[in-house]
Structures are given as structure tokens and as C-alpha cells.
Amino acid sequence: MSLLRNRLQDLPALCLCVLVLACIGACQSEAYEGTPSPPPKLKMSHWSLVTGRMKELLEPVLKRTRDRWQWFWSPSTFRGFMQTYYDDHLRDLGPRTKAWLLKSKESLLNKTHSLCPRIVCGDKDQG
């Protein structure tokens, strides 16, 4: 049972890794589209056959992933996300920061004044 729980905890990290690999593959396939084909001698090597087969297997998956996530990478979607994030978290950051600094300053001054009679001035009750 605990093994299943550990696997479920690792699922988001695994999904993120798969997404990153898919994005990298999509970007690389776009970069290689304009490159010339390798010379015939290299074309027949074992490694080129392996890479060719892997490309043949992964290309449809990458194309589907790229097509499905195209809406996310569009400027309007990303701009909308950033605007929402700003509205939710950063719009009133200046006033909140000023209020926090004033509160912290007042708290620090109050603590300092409460310590002053004991440390610097001595107890008022003793004198």
C-alpha cells in the first residue's frame, strides 16, 4: 500500500519531466526541419538507423503534443496568465509591503522601549 502511495506522490514530477521532454523534442524537431540530410555513408550506420526509428516512433507523439499545447504558448494566453497572476498577487504589493514595514518598525520600537528601562536605564522601581 505504501508503495502505491509513493508512486502517486511521484506522479506530478514524472508528468512534468514528460512535458519538458516533449517540449524539448518539439523544439528540436522544428530546428532540424531546415537542415540538409546526412551523407549516404552516415545514413547507413547502425546509430543512424536507431535514431531514425526513434524519430519515426516519436514524431507523431510530439506532433500531437505540440498541437494540443499550441493554445498555451500563444501570446494571448500567456499574457492573460501573467495579467491574472499580477492582479491576484502583485497589484497591491506596494501598499502591503509599506503596511508590513510600518507594523514591523512599530513592533521593533515597542520591544526596544520595553527593554530600555531594564538594560540601559535600570529598573524604575529600584531608583
From Swiss-Prot:
<keyword id="KW-0732">Signal</keyword>
<dbReference type="GO" id="GO:0006869">
    <property type="term" value="P:lipid transport"/>
</dbReference>
<feature type="signal peptide">
    <location>
        <begin position="1"/>
        <end position="27"/>
    </location>
</feature>
<keyword id="KW-0813">Transport</keyword>
<comment type="function">
    <text>May participate in lipoprotein metabolism.</text>
</comment>
<protein>
    <recommendedName>
        <fullName>Apolipoprotein C-IV</fullName>
    </recommendedName>
</protein>
<dbReference type="GO" id="GO:0070328">
    <property type="term" value="P:triglyceride homeostasis"/>
</dbReference>
<keyword id="KW-0445">Lipid transport</keyword>
<dbReference type="GO" id="GO:0034364">
    <property type="term" value="C:high-density lipoprotein particle"/>
</dbReference>
<dbReference type="GO" id="GO:0010890">
    <property type="term" value="P:positive regulation of triglyceride storage"/>
</dbReference>
<dbReference type="InterPro" id="IPR028120">
    <property type="entry name" value="APOC4"/>
</dbReference>
<comment type="similarity">
    <text>Belongs to the apolipoprotein C4 family.</text>
</comment>
<dbReference type="Pfam" id="PF15119">
    <property type="entry name" value="APOC4"/>
</dbReference>
<dbReference type="GO" id="GO:0034361">
    <property type="term" value="C:very-low-density lipoprotein particle"/>
</dbReference>
<keyword id="KW-0964">Secreted</keyword>
